[in-house]
Amino acid sequence: MAKKQRYNTTQRKELRKKEVDYIKELETKIDEYDASINKPVFFKDLPISNSTLKGLNDSAFLKLTDIQRDSIPMSLKGYDILGAAKTGSGKTLAFLIPVLEKLYRERWTEFDGLGALIISPTRELAMQIYEVLLKIGTSTSFSAGLVIGGKDVKFEMERISKINILIGTPGRILQHMDQAIGLNTSNLQMLVLDEADRCLDMGFKKTLDAIVSNLPPTRQTLLFSATQSQSLEDLARLSLTDYKTIGNPDILNPSNGKVLGPSTPETLQQSYINVELPDKLDMLYSFIKSHLKSKMIVFLSSSKQVHFVYETFRKMQPGISLMHLHGRQKQKARTETLDKFNRAQHVCLFATDVVARGIDFPAIDWVVQVDCPEDVDTYIHRVGRCARYGKQGKSMIMLTPQEEEGFLKRLASRKIEPSKLTIKQSKKKSIKPQLQSLLFKDPELKYLGQKAFISYIRSVFIQKDKEVFKFEELPTDEFANSLGLPGAPKIKMKGTKSVEQIKQMKNASRQLLSLAKTNEDGELVEEKSKQPVRTKYDKMFERKNQTVLSEHYLNITKAQAQEDEDDDFISIKRTDHALNEEELPQLSLPSSRRAQKRALSKKASLSTKGNATRVVFDDDGAAHPVYELQGEEDFIKAGAAEDQKLEYLQKEKDVMNEVDVEDKQVAKQKKQEKKRKRLEAIRREMEADMDNESSGEEKVPFLGTGNLSDDMQDPDSDDEEGSRLRKRSRFETNNNYNDNDSDDGVIQVEEPQTLEDLESLTARLIDN
């Protein structure tokens, strides 16, 4: 390994001076650069540093896209950017390159604190941005960090003070701002919001406002998304006054309010099919069966639907790998699923909108939307998972007759016109019988189907666009049957929150919510329990099952016909209460101790009760004694005694004949087994004889057996060592294989090996 070159003080001063001169020259090029005149095509045509350019070349990023060509020069000059471009157009590099260049020109070090903050609405998108930054920043000396939910907070807090570029989700970033001691944002140079319209909506409003309040107003702000917002209120929250709008073919022009162009890629083939709600799963299964050599993403509206469709389709085995991804999974499972899906060639991923924004999946062939999205922006982000970077892609959305007219009108307002597909009858396949069979056999799967039904109905109920989502026209009974359920579960819509309220509660900080329960001193006040202290027996009787026998499961499985109107506020509940002594029976107690002892004695009680009688029960449940004597009248009705005797003998003979056949088979099997064992013993004896004859051959060593001294012995002493280790027979002496007879009359012979040896030994004994 080559030694690191060391410089003296003079050389270091010269290097620093060269770097300062190079940065000044670079800033001069940036000020004089005009993209409209130069029209750059490659990254090397831009006024960026050599270290950033080297990282781009090593990562095979050579050619500029439209959004990069228009936004990077403006970002380098220090303008605030409101960037919008079609999905898959390279927006990530459009803000990562200015971040690296800004910190490089400022000569940023780890002692300067946090220099750039990049906020992403989802964990998966934040991880993707972090991976791209690691690729293009290999030649720089900046430190980068990723903070997302599902990771160890203490581990992040210990290292966040040395981070120059921080990437994360809004909730975790705000948590570190409140708790991490070493996080200093006073010197922040750049703030980047990826998928800015999602970060600025109601779900992250309070969190983002709290983050922005901790940042200096002199920062540079970059906003990027495929569906950008120009709301003056949102821009004022981020202190955007003098900003540049870049790459805006899909943004509403603030002057005339007209759409300037479609926001989906030209290489994307968009289509839709008109299908009834109860037939959606049949259509989805038929589509998957006819596209087994494809890589597709199937979007559904809720995590419970994703889980139900994945579990049922997995049991039916359509012939393609199936995966599922939703926000209720653990972070480790989500990361592993994304990694497997990216590496797979032919696979189907059932997912919610957690992966609808920004995630760059390689080589997606189809994007299928089973449920209608809440708005056109969600539709654009979903279909944007395919046809990225100029590649081909296809998308299909399933619209019910109630949704078709209204949603197509919304798409036409954004110049999106999908073509209508007609499915061949030969390609359609009904899976309702299979679903009913699966749910009948598996109660937990049935419970999952009921929750999927409820989640879909509620998702339609809370939508704001009532022209598209017509709740009153939903065929609930038919939809429940299509899921394999015997009937539609009971749903309570009272007090259902809106979409904005649900998003706000989902993204709210748990620690901020806990502050509402604190007193003036900041101590957490626990509510006093009004119930008395419960014993372990009370807890045992109050214990309830948490699976399919839970209270929630029993509530949704009740038949609506059996429920009364009063069930909403009156229900039977087990309680412990005092018993009325007047209703208790008066039992006579023994007066003397001898009587009490006799009453408790089992032997004494049996003497008065008599012997136990054994009974048997027939098919009708009636009890009979084991042995019943036939009466005289019944015996006469059965016929003559000789006839009954012959009938009984014939019956027993038939039974014996049947048993005799079985006994013969058992005897035959035992005989064959005995013969097999005898032949096996003969074979083992023959193998042992062959081993003794070939004892002079070289031994095969085995690892881990024997002694080290055995492995190191002299080859010439094999026979002697073998004879020493071998157990001697009763007619062998210390002098092995000695043919001479001793003086005491004992015949000493070799060990008999064959039948001839035994015959010769017998003859010698007779002669003696």
Curated annotation (Swiss-Prot):
ATP-dependent RNA helicase required for ribosome biogenesis. Involved in the release of U14 snoRNA in pre-ribosomal complexes. Required for pre-rRNA cleavage at site A2. ATP binds at A85, K86, T87, G88, S89, G90, K91, T92. Signal peptide: none annotated. The Q motif is unique to and characteristic of the DEAD box family of RNA helicases and controls ATP binding and hydrolysis. It catalyses: ATP + H2O = ADP + phosphate + H(+). Residues 667-678 have a biased composition (Basic residues). Residues 653-666 have a biased composition (Basic and acidic residues). It holds the Pfam family CTE_SPB4. Keywords: ATP-binding, Helicase, Hydrolase, Nucleotide-binding, Nucleus, Ribosome biogenesis, RNA-binding, rRNA processing. It comes from Vanderwaltozyma polyspora (strain ATCC 22028 / DSM 70294 / BCRC 21397 / CBS 2163 / NBRC 10782 / NRRL Y-8283 / UCD 57-17) (Kluyveromyces polysporus). PROSITE patterns: DEAD_ATP_HELICASE (PS00039), HELICASE_ATP_BIND_1 (PS51192), HELICASE_CTER (PS51194), Q_MOTIF (PS51195). Residues 711-721 have a biased composition (Acidic residues). This is ATP-dependent RNA helicase DBP4. The keyword Ubl conjugation does not apply. PANTHER family: RNA HELICASE (PTHR24031). A motif (DEAD box) lies at residues 194-197. One of its GO terms (biological process) is rRNA processing. Its EC number is 3.6.4.13. Residues 581-612, 653-754 are annotated as: Disordered.
